[in-house]
Design a protein with these regions (language model features):
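Short secondary-structure boundary/capping segments
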Residues: 2, 25, 80, 98-100
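Short connector loops at helix/strand junctions that flank enzyme active sites
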Residues: 5-7, 35, 83-85
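Short loop segments at secondary-structure junctions
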Residues: 14-17, 28, 91-96, 112-113
């Protein structure tokens, strides 16, 4: 069994009609709902990989990025691998347009309750509840914020 640690995952948040919503994507392979996720390439940091994956999958550019202070873990029985993914939280503007690539067939901006109903895996639900508790119900810890002067969002993709 292999431990895979070159993986990232993140929740994208926005406001819609005064309500916080998160972006869910429907996978082309499998047809299930999920958050943005993907592999870290050799020359990237985890946060760079998340921003690249977010842009590749949706063409969304966030205005703020945080470490979620959360590691998402799961076992893939098909490949007999354990995945450990660094978690991120991205904030984007309310009028953000989503343009899907070939990996997804649909998207939705969901409330937490809607997301918990749509996703198939308990680990996803735990991640979303963590994000809501620490990034929606209260202001996120400033220590978790990746400063835009350091990150240079637009230079990543």
């Amino acid at each position: 069994m292999e431990l895979v640690t070159n993986f990232v995952s993140g929740v994208v948040l926005t406001k819609h009609q005064q309500q916080t919503r998160m972006l869910l994507l429907k996978r082309a392979d499998g047809g299930y709902w999920c958050q943005v996720a993907g592999s870290i390439e050799k020359s990237e940091s985890a946060w760079q990989a998340f921003l690249r994956e977010l842009y590749e999958e949706t063409q969304v550019s966030p205005y703020e990025l945080y470490s979620a202070d959360y590691l998402q873990q799961f076992y893939n029985f098909h490949s007999d691998q354990i995945f450990v993914a660094a978690g991120f939280v991205a904030y984007c503007e309310p009028d953000t347009q989503v343009v899907l690539n070939h990996e997804h067939t649909d998207y939705r901006w969901c409330t937490l309750e809607e997301a918990l109903e749509l996703v198939p895996f308990p680990n996803q639900r735990k991640f979303y509840q963590h994000v809501w508790q620490y990034f929606v119900a209260q202001n996120p810890a400033l220590e978790l914020k990746l400063e835009s002067s350091t990150v240079h969002f637009r230079d990543i993709y």
